[in-house]
Amino acid sequence: MSHELLRETPSQTAGPYVHIGLALAAAGNPTRDLEIWNRMAREDAPGQHILLLGHVYDGNGHLVRDSFLEFWQADSEGRYQERYDPEQPFNSFGRTATTFDAGEWTLHTVKPGVVRNAQGVPMAPHINMALFARGINIHLHTRLYFDDEAEANAACPVLNLIEQAPRRDTLVARRCEVNGQLAYRFDIRIQGDNETVFFDF
C-alpha cells in the first residue's frame, strides 16, 4: 500500500489574534471556566513557591508587549503531570502573556526538581518555555535555569551543549524578591546583543 507524503503546512506569525484565542483576560474578553493561565501551583502545592517574571525584547532592544509564552516543567519532585487537571494542586503546563503597558510577564509556580534525561543523567532544575510573538513564524523554544543552582547548572548535560559561557548565561534567571516573595527574573532577547539561546527541539 503506497502512502502519499503531504507537504508541511506553512507556519505563520502569531499576529494580533493570539490574545483573543489564548490570553482572553489580556485581550479584555471574558475568561473560560477552564482557563490555563499563569498560576501553575496552588497554595497547597508542595515545594518552594516562586514567582517568575521578565520582559521580552526584540532585536532593537524594544519591549515586545504582545508576546505569548507557554511553560512545561516538572513538579518539586522532578515529575511531570501527564494531563492538565484543575483539581490537582500543581500542573506541569502553564501560559502567560506580556502586558500591553509594562511589557512584563509573570508566572506563579514551584521550583522544579531534578529530571533525568533519556540516558539517565540528571539535568539541572529548569523550565521549558515556548515563545510566540509577532514576526516569529515558528515559535521559539528555550529553557529557564536558576542562578542559585550553580553546581547543578555546571553539570547539566543540556546546558553544557552550549560551548560559550556567556551564551549559557542567557538561560539563567536571576534570584530576587518581589513584595517579600522569592522570585526569579528572566528576560528574553529575541535577537541582538545577548540574544537568548533557543533550541531546535
Q: Where does each model-flagged region fall?
A:
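Beta-strand-dominated extracellular/periplasmic modules and repeats
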Residues: 1-201
